[in-house]
């Protein structure tokens, strides 16, 4: 039987009443730490892109738990910092690019042997600039330099591949970025850039709005001409060493959404975007003959 001196017992009792049990742990902190260090992880889904990822209950972590290899964050330059949100009205000084994405990614990479996923799958952070492109890039570039140990970068035209690839979308400061002798980010092109002679390390991705290129929205079979055009776009991008992404595809659970996702996957589109993490994860795993709880390793194609 454990004996405790009366005075010490009273002290411990009062202390526990004031601050809670000595062994109590903040569940939120414990849960987030587990996300960073847990050796068991979801199967990496190289085609899965989390559109407006910051809208989820736990930005970044919900996407990682579902195996997403690409996430998107909209940013505004406010008083020298990059705040994350879709509009000025929803910005919060505590929700920054560093706090929501760069810091937790760096923690995970350090804990995971230099990778976001243990199998080494490429991970993309798409930064959609909503404020002035040039002014925001200057701040973003300095910020990214602090995280260079995990970031793919280009020095004097030579690519140094690392765990996380940053791509800038939205208001893109093309000239300033292109002239930067050391870059920690590439730039998101458009379909009009498909045959551009810009190097793939400067423009590693081609993205555009789905209904600007296609009329088909998942109802009935995809017309042969549009199916051929989709494959042509992917082939042309591959020829120039670039990846492909479309935004604003159907995203409400429906046969139409499944039909569009199926065509994107069959054509080899690299990033399939969604707000429905569970839905896209389940779809991609079903195409791979796996379950949502699979804990297996897959190989991925190395990209810039």
Each PLM stretch: what is its role?
Residues 10-21:
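Bacterial N-terminal signal peptides
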Residues 2-11:
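Bacterial N-terminal signal peptides that target proteins for export
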Residues 24-45, 62-69, 76-304:
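Catalytic cores of phosphodiester-bond hydrolases, prominently lipid phosphodiesterases
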Residues 56-61:
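A structural motif detector for short, solvent-exposed N-terminal "entry" segments of globular domains
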């Amino acid at each position: 039987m454990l004996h405790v001196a009366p005075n010490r017992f009273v002290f411990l009792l009062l202390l526990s009443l004031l601050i809670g049990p000595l062994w109590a742990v903040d569940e939120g902190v414990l849960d987030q730490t587990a996300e960073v260090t847990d050796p068991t992880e979801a199967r990496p889904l190289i085609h899965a892109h989390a559109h407006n990822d910051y809208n989820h209950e736990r930005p970044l972590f919900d996407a990682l738990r579902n195996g997403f290899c690409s996430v998107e964050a909209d940013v505004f330059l406010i008083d020298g910092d990059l705040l994350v949100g879709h509009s000025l009205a929803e910005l919060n000084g505590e929700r920054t690019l560093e706090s929501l994405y760069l810091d937790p990614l760096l923690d995970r990479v350090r804990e995971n042997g230099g990778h976001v996923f243990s199998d080494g799958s490429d991970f993309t952070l798409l930064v959609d600039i909503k404020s002035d492109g040039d002014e925001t890039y200057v701040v973003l570039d300095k910020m990214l330099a602090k995280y260079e140990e995990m970031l793919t970068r280009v020095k004097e035209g030579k690519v140094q591949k690392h765990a996380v690839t940053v791509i800038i979308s939205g208001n893109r400061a093309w000239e300033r970025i292109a002239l930067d002798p050391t870059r920690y980010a590439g730039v998101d092109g458009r379909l009009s850039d498909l045959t551009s002679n810009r190097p793939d390390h400067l423009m590693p991705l081609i993205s555009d709005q789905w209904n600007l290129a296609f009329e088909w929205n998942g109802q009935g079979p995809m017309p042969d001409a549009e199916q051929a055009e989709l494959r042509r776009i992917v082939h042309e991008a591959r020829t120039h060493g670039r990846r492909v992404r479309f935004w604003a595809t159907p995203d409400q659970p429906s046969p139409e959404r499944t039909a569009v996702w199926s065509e994107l996957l069959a054509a080899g589109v690299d990033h399939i975007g969604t707000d429905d993490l569970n839905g896209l994860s389940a779809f991609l795993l079903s195409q791979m003959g796996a379950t949502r709880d699979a804990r297996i390793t897959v190989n991925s194609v190395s990209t810039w």
